[in-house]
């Protein structure tokens, strides 16, 4: 997640800070393509290989930091808390979607192994 893409909304009368990020639908696919496929292949692209929604992250996410009545409201502290919550939420989603991709790749490789074995190519 790029921190510079995070937007904040401060609602002082409710003592709330909301951190949000948009345009992250392809982040898991991009991480997979750039981190793993770029080293193994020249131009294999996951998006063109599979059109599956389970690989797509949500378009946007948000996290809310609420100040309890006993504490003093601080916009900066609220931003830190909201960003931490958003980062954790984003990373859980990224990990889950990368696992979907890894499982699909494993199935594909298993199918290739069966094919190669059947045709005595191995």
Task: Please provide the spans of the model-predicted regions.
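Catalytic phosphate/metal-binding cores of nucleic-acid and nucleotide-processing enzymes, i.e., regions
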Residues: 1-122
């Amino acid at each position: 997640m790029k921190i510079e893409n995070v937007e904040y909304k401060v609602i002082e009368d409710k003592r709330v800070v909301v951190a949000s990020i948009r345009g992250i639908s392809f982040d898991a696919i991009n991480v997979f393509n750039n981190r793993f496929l770029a080293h193994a292949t020249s131009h294999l692209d996951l998006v063109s290989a599979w059109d599956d929604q389970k690989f797509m992250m949500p378009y946007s996410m948000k996290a809310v930091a609420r100040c309890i009545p006993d504490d003093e409201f601080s916009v900066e502290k609220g931003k830190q808390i909201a960003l931490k919550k958003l980062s954790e939420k984003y990373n859980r989603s990224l990990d889950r979607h990368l696992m979907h991709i890894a499982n699909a790749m494993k199935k594909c490789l298993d199918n290739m192994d069966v094919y190669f074995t059947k045709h005595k190519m191995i």
